[in-house]
């Protein structure tokens, strides 16, 4: 599973986790708000800003009954038709260029999730550096082939997909030209609970499909994302908003700016902590060896006096013989007078 780049940023185990701030519909249909979200994401240290590219008409039909109406009382969007929800949540296509331009000015990558083939054509006209396939679209093989044919890196959320479905999607992507692929473990509930996140799947995904892996995290807070890095995640995606109290279609499970800054710093710290398999003192620990216990003279000893548990003891610092040698020393005679506080060495043991 080779590392690769999105823009100038390396995606892989030898680079810090690639953190994506997902705007979704948290702009609340205000371009000014959208641009402020971009600025806040950049200030928080996110590496990329992601949009979703669709219209209500490319997503569904304008019907407000039956399966086109959200009746689940536990849903964040209960009482809305699918069409009305997507009307509220979509990012107008004419906003994409100024949003992407502002992100670029701030040194941040920007790309999007297309939900149909027309969105891919539109995003190609804006020369996006990568694409994301949403979890509900990961079985849309024609869409995956369309994105793969661009030759750009592709990120796919796994959501509810079975191994067989993921295998079909990954094969389709690779056969159509995708060489740089990331699979994101994703739980398609909003919000998701930590218990349903199952991030132990992350290394299994990497093993099965030989690609970079990560997490699209819908849980509250940053704990699951940080843990995902320890499981091998090289990409972390989180929804982002300026203030959850302002509301918005996805605001309730989105990170605020200070939380995004924490996500960026703590996932990088987790990555730094991974290191490699290592035993023994590191270079940084060499000075700490002195704080080990070792054998010291704890009472003045005369020449010829025998060593006993009363005049030698294992204490700190660690400049004397290792404590494991005490049985070999006890009962033997001192070659010379030894002052209390002297580190014991073989040359004074008779």
Ranges and model annotations:
Residues 1-350:
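Catalytic cores and adjacent flexible loops of soluble metabolic enzymes
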């Amino acid at each position: 599973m080779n590392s690769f780049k999105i823009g100038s940023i390396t995606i892989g185990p030898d680079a810090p986790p690639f953190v994506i701030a997902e705007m979704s519909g948290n702009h609340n249909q205000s371009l000014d708000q959208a641009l402020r979200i971009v600025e806040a994401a950049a200030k928080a240290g996110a590496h990329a800003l992601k949009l979703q590219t669709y219209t209500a008409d490319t997503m569904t039909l304008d019907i407000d009954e039956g399966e086109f109406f959200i009746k689940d009382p536990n849903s964040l969007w209960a009482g809305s038709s699918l069409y009305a929800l997507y009307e509220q949540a979509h990012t107008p296509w004419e906003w994409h260029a100024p949003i992407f331009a502002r992100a670029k000015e701030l040194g941040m990558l920007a790309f999007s999730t297309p939900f149909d083939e027309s969105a891919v054509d539109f995003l190609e006209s804006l020369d996006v550096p990568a694409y994301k396939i949403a979890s509900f679209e990961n079985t849309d093989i024609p869409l995956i082939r369309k994105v793969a044919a661009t030759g750009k890196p592709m990120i796919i959320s796994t959501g509810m997909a079975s191994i067989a479905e993921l295998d079909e999607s990954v094969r389709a992507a690779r056969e159509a030209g995708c060489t740089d692929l990331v699979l994101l473990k994703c739980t398609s509930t909003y919000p998701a609970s930590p218990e349903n996140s199952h991030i132990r799947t992350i290394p299994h995904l990497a093993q099965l499909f030989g690609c970079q892996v990560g997490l699209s995290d819908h849980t509250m807070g940053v704990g699951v994302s940080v843990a995902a890095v320890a499981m091998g995640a090289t990409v972390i995606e989180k929804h982002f908003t300026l203030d959850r109290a302002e509301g918005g279609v996805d605001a309730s499970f989105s990170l605020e700016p200070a939380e995004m800054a924490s996500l960026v710093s703590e996932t990088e710290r987790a990555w730094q902590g991974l290191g490699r398999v290592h035993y023994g003192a590191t270079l940084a620990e060499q000075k700490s060896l002195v704080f080990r216990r070792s054998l010291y003279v704890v009472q003045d000893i005369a020449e010829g006096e025998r060593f006993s548990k009363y005049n030698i003891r294992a204490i700190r610092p660690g400049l004397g013989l290792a404590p494991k040698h005490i049985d070999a020393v006890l009962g033997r005679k001192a070659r010379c007078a030894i002052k209390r506080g002297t580190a014991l060495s073989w040359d004074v043991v008779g």
